[in-house]
UniProtKB/Swiss-Prot annotation:
Name of the molecule in the record: Glutamine-dependent NAD(+) synthetase
Active-site residues, as the UniProt record annotates them: E41 (proton acceptor), K109 (for glutaminase activity), C145 (nucleophile)
Residues binding deamido-NAD(+), per UniProt: N399, E428, K538
Organism: Aquifex aeolicus (strain VF5)
Coiled coil, from the record: none
GO biological process, one term: NAD biosynthetic process
Gene that encodes the chain: nadE
Domain CN hydrolase: 2-242
Keyword field contains Ligase: yes
Length: 567
């Protein structure tokens, strides 16, 4: 029997000292009940450290903290696996395996992702050697994140050399539908290699990335043995009968046949550890889609605010669905006492919008201010009229209202050190239906990667918990209220159609003609994609926000601003 502890923790990029202290605390508290304690990928530096990895003094701090962890383990009879940047003639994404003040081995990540949000080739050299140790007569191998996604990679090599447990440490970002696929594929890895697979993941928000945790252990029979909580720190200890791997291999000749002609991996070190208390696997519930997305957005917002030294946020409340939903999210993430809402009516704002914004603020119990912009707008208009003479009201006059509102919000930010939340959604950001330096402005954009139709679904989910958003907000046509009788559909296709086009174009990477063949209207498709192309300059200047789809604007989307291609 082997007791494995997966330390699913929320680390902070660059806080080497704080991250080290978290690691030491877990070692102190869990060494008596564990044979192996595994921490996530690059847990010492935080993930992703990006260009901090190019600073020698940062690497020196990581090395110093690593030495302190090694020293700390001298009095504990437990194996500790810690992720860190490791310099040895070159820089590696590494995993150090330590026992009683001695490094048993350093595993260096083999497969470096360089797609989507990942840039690991920019920083790291690929590792080449596997790492397998023997614990109480059982072979245990280690790997890092991307390595396990390759069916014939290091896990296969060590399994065919007798590994009964593969410990894979991760910093795997969340997006919708990823977890179910990941769990299914990890079960396949365990069944194919006829061994236990333990997958420990990071949890928390880091800029635009969200890490969902949900560390899991799978048996050689493909059975889920243990699963940690979603979107929360969790320490998961489980007792594994590693003899299961041997029993399974005696029944399944694939392992024997697959091992012929393969280069064998030798055991790096053997360690004998005392028997420890039995722990049955705990399987935490997997959240449903709306609950999962909401938890991701909430965690991302909370971590961005707190890790960057803010306490309070301010946002404009328009009486519409986007700002209403973001206000609810902010209250749930930060507490009502830390959220300020500002309603800024113009001559085009309706009485209903004021009533809905006020009702929302009262329901949430947040501080609520009303600052009319009509006279401010008139002062702008009068000054422009002196120079331009006759002015015909058009989109420039609409946008100046949004920019006045942004100035007011940033006054609160500057005066009281509140973080301004942008309430722009993915549908608007995609097609540029947002005012640059206006409603698009902010320090963080919590729904930047949430399609408009999803905003409605998530708001309904939030109202099922507490009905704080007035029902009228769901039913009225969406409008920026920048001119009389305006609705979003004056300019855009219906959101039900628009969002389908956006998903097919952005996430599934289809061409306009391929989208049309899916049954969507030709005019709407070409209009939408032309708007996407023309508004790249806006997206380049948008605040960051959490990635929750398979392809988000930001690190995931690297289109040129100057671009003539359109087919």
């Amino acid at each position: 029997m082997l007791n494995l502890t997966l330390a699913q923790l929320n680390f902070t990029v660059g806080d080497v000292e704080g991250n080290k202290e978290k690691i030491l605390k877990v070692i102190d508290e869990y060494s008596e009940k564990s044979h192996i304690i595994a921490f996530p990928e690059l847990s010492l530096s935080g993930y992703p450290p990006e260009d901090l990895l190019l600073q020698p003094h940062f690497l020196k701090e990581c090395e110093k903290a690593f030495d302190q962890i090694i020293h700390h383990t001298r009095n504990y009879d437990v194996i500790v696996a810690v992720g860190l940047p490791y310099y040895e003639f070159d820089l590696y994404n590494a995993l150090a395996v330590i026992h009683r003040g001695e490094v048993l081995g350093i595993y260096k990540k083999h497969f470096l992702p360089n797609y989507s949000v990942f840039d690991e080739y920019r920083y790291f050299r690929k590792g080449e050697e596997p790492l397998m140790i023997e614990v109480n007569g059982h072979k245990v191998s280690f790997s890092i994140c991307e390595d396990i996604w390759y069916p014939d990679g290091v896990e296969r090599q060590t399994a065919l050399s007798g590994a009964e447990l593969i410990v894979n440490v991760n910093a795997s970002p969340y997006h919708v539908n990823k977890y179910s696929f990941k769990e299914s594929f990890l079960k396949s890895r365990a069944e194919d290699n006829l061994c236990f697979v333990a997958y420990v993941n990071l949890v928390g928000g880091q800029d635009e990335l969200v890490f969902d945790g949900r560390s899991i252990v799978i048996s050689p029979f493909g059975k889920l043995v243990a699963r940690a909580k979603a979107f929360e720190e969790d320490i998961l200890t489980v007792t594994l009968d590693l003899g299961e791997a041997k029993r399974k291999r005696l029944l399944d000749l694939r392992w024997r046949e697959g091992s012929y002609g393969r280069e064998k991996v030798n055991v790096k070190r053997s360690v004998s550890l005392p028997d420890k208390e039995f722990f049955r696997g705990r399987i935490e519930e997997n959240p449903k889609e709306e609950e999962e997305i909401y938890a991701a957005l909430k965690l991302s917002l909370r971590d961005y605010v707190r890790k960057n030294g803010f306490e309070k946020v301010v946002l404009g409340l328009s009486g519409g669905i986007d700002s209403s939903f973001v206000a609810c999210l902010a209250v749930d993430a930060l507490g009502r006492e830390n959220v300020k809402g500002v309603y800024m009516p113009s001559q085009f704002s309706s009485k209903e919008s004021y009533e809905d914004a006020k009702a929302l603020a009262q329901n949430l119990g947040i501080e609520f201010h009303v600052i009319p912009i009509k006279e401010i707008y008139r002062a702008y208009f009068n000054e422009f009229e002196k120079e331009i003479c006759e002015i015909t009201f058009d989109v420039a006059d609409e946008n100046i209202q949004a920019r006045i509102r942004a100035n007011i919000l940033f006054y609160f930010s500057n005066k009281f050190r509140y973080l301004v939340l942008s309430t722009s959604n993915k549908s608007e950001t995609a097609v540029g239906y947002t005012t640059i330096y206006g409603d698009m402005a902010g320090g963080f954009a919590p729904i930047k990667d949430v399609y408009k139709t999803w905003v409605y679904k998530l708001a309904r989910y939030r109202n099922s918990i507490s009905p704080d958003i007035p029902e009228r907000v769901f039913k009225k046509p969406p409008s920026a209220e920048l001119r009389p009788n305006q609705t979003d559909q004056d300019v855009l296709p219906p959101y039900e159609i628009l969002d389908q086009i956006l998903m097919l174009y952005i996430e599934e990477n289809l061409s306009p003609e391929e989208i049309i063949r899916k049954g969507l209207p030709r005019d709407a498709v070409y209009k939408t994609i032309n708007m996407i192309r023309k508004n790249e300059y806006k997206r380049k200047q948008a605040p960051i926000g959490p990635k929750i789809t398979s392809r988000a604007f930001g690190k995931d989307w690297r289109m040129p601003v100057t671009n003539k291609f359109f087919k």
